[in-house]
Structure formats: C-alpha cells, structure tokens
C-alpha cells in the first residue's frame, strides 16, 4: 500500500477526519487539505450558506469539483466531507488516487462530538440522532466499499489514531 502517496480520510460527521488528518499530515510531512474548508475558501462563504442558497445538490457539485482537483495533487492527506462518498465519481477518484482510510465511529460518539456544532446543516433538526442513524445506513457501506484500511476512532485521541493509521499503512 505504501506506493500510493496520498491518504484520503472518509467517514461520518464527528469521526475526527479533520483533526486526525492534521496530525497525520504533520507526522508524515505531507500537505493537509479539508474538502469542506476548500469549498469555503473557493466560495467565500461557509458550508451552511452554500446549503441555504444552493441546496444540498449545489453543495455536492462543488464538493465533487474540489475533491477531483485535490486528489490530483501528490503527497497529501485529505479529510473529505461525510457525504462525499455518495458520489460514484468521488469514490472512483479516492480509490484510484490514494489510500482510503475509513474512520469508523459510533452514533453515540457522533452525537457527542457534533451536538454543539452549528456548522453542520444536516444536523440542524429536532432529532439529530435519527438523522445520523439514517445517514449511517446509507453511507457506511460506501465507506467500507472503498476503504483500504478501517480504523475505529472511539475513545482514542487523534494522535493515537494517526499513529495507528501510520502503523497499518506501514509508513
């Protein structure tokens, strides 16, 4: 697996993709990118605004373009948005252009980690747990489909998880 130079992190909201990705990039001396942050940078607006104005479909179009662009780079760690795997094109980019690491977490951990985060448009509802359960049903099989490595993130620090990823990848 070490012949692929890019590492792409996939997984649900609250799995720790951005935090773990930063640690991983630093430890491996790679460039770190976050697809959501890149969308915000390109649009000059936050994700919630993009959802409000363009809807989820507009956001997903932007996300696909950003991930297509970023996965063409070499020597990066990319934290993807939780829903990015819904796109067959994105799954293909990720699988073909790097090592895909699925950061797995429980619904309980997701709720705990995201409950105060107002930047997550899909969770601004009365019952976010129900939304997370529904998303898990449809997305978890897609994460598993493209994963080269699966790492559980519950009850571990980001640094510990980053070290586990490095060990599993043989870097």
Curated annotation (Swiss-Prot):
GO terms for cellular component: cytosol. The lineage of its organism: Bacteria, Pseudomonadati, Pseudomonadota, Gammaproteobacteria, Alteromonadales. Substrate binds at residues 36, 60, 82, 139. Keywords: Amino-acid biosynthesis, Aromatic amino acid biosynthesis, ATP-binding, Cytoplasm, Kinase, Magnesium, Metal-binding, Nucleotide-binding, Transferase. Catalyzes the specific phosphorylation of the 3-hydroxyl group of shikimic acid using ATP as a cosubstrate. InterPro entries: P-loop_NTPase, Shikimate/glucono_kinase, Shikimate_kinase/TSH1, Shikimate_kinase_CS. Pfam families: SKI (PF01202). It catalyses: shikimate + ATP = 3-phosphoshikimate + ADP + H(+). Mg(2+) binds at residue 18. Pathway: Metabolic intermediate biosynthesis; chorismate biosynthesis; chorismate from D-erythrose 4-phosphate and phosphoenolpyruvate: step 5/7. ATP binds at residues 14-19, 120, 156. GO terms for biological process: amino acid biosynthetic process; aromatic amino acid family biosynthetic process; chorismate biosynthetic process. It comes from Shewanella amazonensis (strain ATCC BAA-1098 / SB2B). Monomer. Binds 1 Mg(2+) ion per subunit. This is Shikimate kinase.
């Amino acid at each position: 697996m070490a012949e692929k130079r890019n590492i792409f992190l996939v997984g649900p909201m609250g799995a720790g993709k951005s935090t773990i990705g930063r640690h991983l990039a630093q430890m491996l001396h790679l460039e770190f990118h976050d697809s959501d942050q890149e969308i915000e940078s390109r649009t000059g607006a936050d994700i919630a605004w993009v959802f409000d104005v363009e809807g989820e479909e507009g956001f997903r179009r932007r996300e696909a373009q950003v991930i297509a662009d970023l996965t063409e780079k070499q020597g990066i760690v990319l934290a993807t948005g939780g829903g990015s795997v819904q796109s067959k094109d994105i799954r293909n980019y990720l699988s073909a252009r790097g090592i895909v690491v699925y950061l797995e977490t429980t619904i309980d951990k997701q709720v705990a980690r995201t409950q105060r985060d107002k930047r997550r448009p899909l969770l601004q509802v009365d019952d976010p747990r129900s939304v997370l359960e529904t998303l898990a049903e449809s997305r978890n099989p897609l994460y598993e489909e493209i994963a080269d490595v699966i790492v559980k993130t519950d009850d571990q620090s980001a640094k510990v998880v980053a070290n586990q990823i490095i060990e599993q990848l043989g870097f």
